[in-house]
Regions:
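Non-globular, low-confidence helical/coil segments that flank catalytic cores
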Residues: 1-234
Length: 234
């Protein structure tokens, strides 16, 4: 997700070239276009949220600038998450949130740590009511209810949190199932972005989804996965 700063700067530079160089403007604009095409292969510095291609799993990166980021889950493949973070030029993970101990969310951990400093890590050591402020983002944990929570279904001990900045509100809930989603009703309100629980499976609490009323709903899945994610009903 980007803000379009590159497009604005491109137009501004083009106008300045025409005004000040005239005859050389066309040649210079061609060179500029080639540079921008090359530059465009890499994420702009003004992006807020990036979804890593980790296959059937989750891997989300929130930009803190200066090569720092918040990372939510790391997918199943160390190589894929490492490749993504290198592409984004992330050298410091200010907060690594591993929502729950399933391979499609945590097995890539060695790749995320490779050559990077991890300043704080949440997995099973955080509970509802906990808060943090990292850069311009505030984070409020809504689930699980206690540290070290245990459930016969590990999905239901996923870390669920609201992450806010001045311009963005994101709700991410790992793989929590409807029984937990119901308990989160009335605690969140409207959000800009909802990281849909459990890869958009058919097990969703529609009342919560209506309360969230997200502008953008994100689902991370592997192409042709055997789980039927995302469900058509979702």
């Amino acid at each position: 997700i980007r803000t379009g700063l590159i497009g604005f700067l491109t137009a501004l530079i083009a106008v300045l070239l025409i005004v000040f160089f005239r005859k050389r403007a066309i040649a210079l604009m061609v060179i500029l276009a080639m540079v921008l095409l090359w530059w465009g292969r890499f994420p702009a510095g003004d992006w807020d949220l990036f979804i890593c291609d980790v296959g059937q799993g989750d891997g989300y990166v929130i930009n803190l600038h200066d090569h720092r980021a918040i990372v939510i889950d790391v997918g199943p493949d160390p190589g894929l998450i490492d490749q993504c973070l290198r592409r984004l030029r992330v050298t410091t993970i200010s907060l690594l949130i591993l929502t729950h101990p399933h391979a499609d969310h945590v097995a890539g951990i060695s790749g995320a740590r490779k050559g990077r400093r991890v300043e704080a890590e949440w997995i099973g050591n955080i509970a509802a009511g906990s808060t943090a402020t990292i850069g311009e983002y505030s984070i409020k944990v809504l689930w699980p209810l206690q540290v070290g929570a245990i459930d016969e279904n590990p999905n239901n001990v996923s870390i669920a949190a609201v992450i806010k900045s001045r311009d963005l509100t994101l709700f991410a809930a790992g793989d929590v199932e409807p029984a937990v989603q119901e308990k989160l009703r009335g605690q969140i309100g409207r959000v800009d972005i909802y990281k849909v629980a459990h890869h958009g499976s058919r097990f969703q609490d529609l009342t919560l989804m209506r309360e969230l009323a997200p502008t953008l709903a994100l689902v991370s899945v592997g192409e042709g996965n055997s789980y039927g994610h995302p469900a058509q009903s979702t």
